[in-house]
Amino acid sequence: MPEVPPLPGAHALREVVDQVFADRGPLSRALPEFEPRPGQREMAVAVAETLETGGRILVEAGTGTGKTLAYLVPAILSRQRVLVSTGTKNLQEQIYFKDLPALAQALGVRFTATCMKGRANYLCLQRLETMCDMGASSSSGVRSPKSGHSKADTGRRTSDPGRRLPDPLLAMIAEWAQETKTGDRAELGDLPEDMALWNDLAATSETCVGSNCPHYDDCFITRMRRRAAQSDVVIVNHHLLCADAAVRQSEYGEVIPACAYGVIDEAHQLEDVATQYFGIAVSNYRVEQLCHEAEQVAASERREAAPEVAMARGQAIERLRDHARAFFMGLQLGRMAAADARAGGDGYMRGSGRRWAAPADAAGAEDRIRLTSEFLADNADAGHELAEALESVEQAFYEVRTAASADEPAGHSASEKRQAQQPEGREDALAIARRAGEIRDDLRFLLRAHDPDFVYYLETRGRGVFLRASPIEVAGIVRSQVLDRFQAVVLTSATLSVAGSFDYVRGRLGAHPAAELSLPSEFDYSQQTILYLPPRMPDPRSPAFAEAAATQIVEILERTRGRAFVLFTSYAMLRAVQPVVEAALSFPILVQGTGARSLLLQQFRTTPNAVLLATSSFWQGVDVAGEALSCVIVDKLPFASPADPVTSARIDAIARRGGEPFWEYQVPLAILTLQQGLGRLIRHRRDRGVLSVLDPRLRTKAYGQTFLAALPPAPVTSSLDAIGRFFGK
């Protein structure tokens, strides 16, 4: 573990940390760009005190505070293993590749660190070998490696000179597998983000057979876990943190090692991530992926399997495909019928005797529709047939007789075979059986739809149809499965409080009791920005709003010369405004959905005067420094749609316990979201620009003052000419 540098007169961790951030302290001497900031120093000392005494602290550190160093320094000097969880992979990599090496040099401290991502980011050697075996038999081509082998191997992956691959991408990955130390797909910079082949190669938990795998010792997940268990600082993201907590009780256990202390950065994102990972979902994609991989396993074992076993497997897979197609098509047709009914004015409200529980004003809910048990009952027969088909696949892949083996007694259930049969070399088949059983159990839970702690809904995305159940409240889950793991935990973000109170975030995350610290931004918003609010705009719910918003956006962008993010609360509004903006302006217009997020950001940074039209995924976790981003426009106050299933369920839950959902949930959530969106503009002391919110409710509604009070303390104007004068300074 790290050795605290000798600092005379300093004994407690907080005293050491305070001296590290002093005007002439180690950071000031060693880091050329370091500027002593009172807020950063105060936060660092508060974090140190929390680590020393235990418990929890909520720290809101305004943009420019330097919160990353403020928690990393006490974490490094604490002499305990510390977990740092971030909202994005970008921040993970910044900490691992930039901040920690700089601190190691500045502090003169020796420590080790591991950056851990979700399993799907890593290559599975077993799946690679299976793919190479299948590819090498098809034709001659590029040589591919034959990797890994028994647990007694030294860990060196060798090549089989007799194997060649026809697929150049597979050959490239196979070649890379021989050289990489991490197996992280991020090393393959030229690999398309949405490449289907990676889905067949990723080390997902669903396909993992754990210590039964012949590549277990060479496995990149195993090696990452071992590195982390020997590290002083473990860096993860919220997705891995919650996914790991969700599977901790499974037979494969957790990936993240035990850590004494935890730091959860970008903590405002944790509720949404927890809602996703502590829920249940069955989709046509999940079932089709099972069928696809079951076919691969069946093909690889066809020569060894008894003929009746091979036939049973093929029939079970085809039966599963047929029933999955019927079930998910039925759900899709039901969704379309409900959408038609809403368009005709029938709201299908819960309690009205209708099947669907979507509000009448369901605009924006086209992708997620809340379901009732009555609707699922209409699809129960198809659902039960699908569950039985999954049972057939489970049984077929637990059947492991070879052509030379004696017949086994009939009548054993799948679970009995699971316990009695663990034949060497059949781990892939057993993994397929296990997955089929898990999907069957999840499907039956979803079809029952009886747990009052969950909200049930149908989600469609592209060609995907997802039947989901999400926890209505995650506070208890987050507290028990995440926060209580640590002796001390720090939750921090630039946006945690509403109207000076942490009550909202504390309640949503179960973070009580907890100390509090709120630090203002280090930026001078009075000089760095202005806030433009249009003098007159239609009601956002009016059909006239889109045209008026497009006109205002064009007027603003003409004065800023592009260089802007225009953030929308819905794709519908983006699509309505896009043609007007493209026709009126000569600036390059980039639109979310036309390319990968990372590619769009890179284009924006490198294209002079660019304008990006985007929705939710660009409201946070995006940094563009300098003049390239000189304006951020928000079309409407970002209230979560009451038609969203999870939102509506949470509104109902608050109302049932006698609360006021609008003020307790909808307003605080919208304020934090708006702060994040507008926070994209000023990221450094030299940044300047214009903020604009087009929604007239900031001035016409009583709650508007609550929003205005939460915005950066910038001069407010309703004059478009003031924008031109601002940039003329």
Question: How should each PLM-predicted stretch be described?
Answer:
Residues 198-234, 242-253, 386, 393-408, ...:
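A contiguous, basic/glycine-rich beta-loop/short-helix subdomain that forms a polymer-engagement track
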Residues 569-593:
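Conserved helicase motor "Helicase C" RecA-like lobe of SF1/SF2 P-loop NTPases
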Residues 52-71:
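Walker A/P-loop
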Residues 534-544, 594-698:
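Conserved RecA-like P-loop NTPase helicase motor core
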Residues 1-30, 63, 80-82, 86-139, ...:
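A substrate-engagement module of RecA-like helicase motors
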Residues 48-49, 68-81, 98-102:
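Walker A/P-loop NTP-binding motif
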Residues 77, 93, 205-207, 211-388, ...:
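Signature of the SF2 helicase/ATPase Hel1-core->accessory helical subdomain module
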Residues 82-88, 490-492, 563-569, 692-694:
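Conserved RecA-like ASCE P-loop NTPase motor core of nucleic-acid helicases/translocases
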